[in-house]
Design a protein with these regions (language model features):
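Residue-level signal for well-ordered alpha-helical scaffold segments within enzymatic catalytic domains
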Residues: 56-59, 83, 87, 110, ...
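Non-catalytic, well-ordered alpha-helical scaffold segments
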Residues: 51, 55, 82-83, 103-106, ...
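Conserved non-catalytic scaffold segment of RNase H-like nuclease domains
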Residues: 1-79
Length: 162
């Protein structure tokens, strides 16, 4: 289950979105759940329904993307996060506002810095680029952290941000 959504604009991480969702099933991996710090019973009473959460997510995207822009899903190991978001967008809204438009930060770093794949761990990237933030498994904080990594890679290789 997708239990929380965190997003931010990569060029303005203070412009962001966060919500927690009600679980859609009672099946879960205890180890994976323990990393999140969530309690499923609490989320059942406080989380948004998937329909509402995805609609709110789309509303936030629409409010932050101008008519001549397209939203791009940027993530660290983008295939993992995008697959959950794509499934929920399609199941609950019928379409994904990102479509298939995405950028994978790991792959971007791998290509720009010509490193071994083992060196694309976020901890190695943080060390090399002197990132100030870290990942803590909170969806919003992770999105802001990933935006920092994305911008540091661009600054290092292109001398500018997006």
């Amino acid at each position: 289950d997708l239990l929380s959504i965190g997003m931010c604009l990569v060029d303005k991480p203070t412009v962001n979105f966060y919500c927690e969702l009600k679980p859609i099933s009672n099946k879960y991996d205890p180890e994976a759940l323990s990393v999140t710090g969530f309690n499923l019973d609490t989320l059942l009473s406080t989380g948004l329904s998937a329909n509402v959460a995805m609609a709110e997510c789309c509303k936030w995207i629409d409010q932050n993307v101008t008519a001549n822009e397209i939203p791009i899903f940027v993530g660290f190991n983008v295939g993992f996060d995008w697959s959950f978001m794509n499934y929920y967008f399609l199941k609950y809204l019928g379409s994904n506002p990102f479509g298939y438009t995405s950028i994978d930060i790991k792959s971007m770093y791998f290509g720009y810095f010509d490193v071994n794949w083992a060196d694309t761990k976020s901890s190695k990237i943080v060390e090399r680029l002197k990132a100030k933030l870290t990942s803590n498994h909170n969806a919003l904080q992770d999105a802001i952290f990933q935006a920092e990594l994305f911008n540091l890679i661009l600054e290092e290789k292109m001398g500018d941000k997006l």
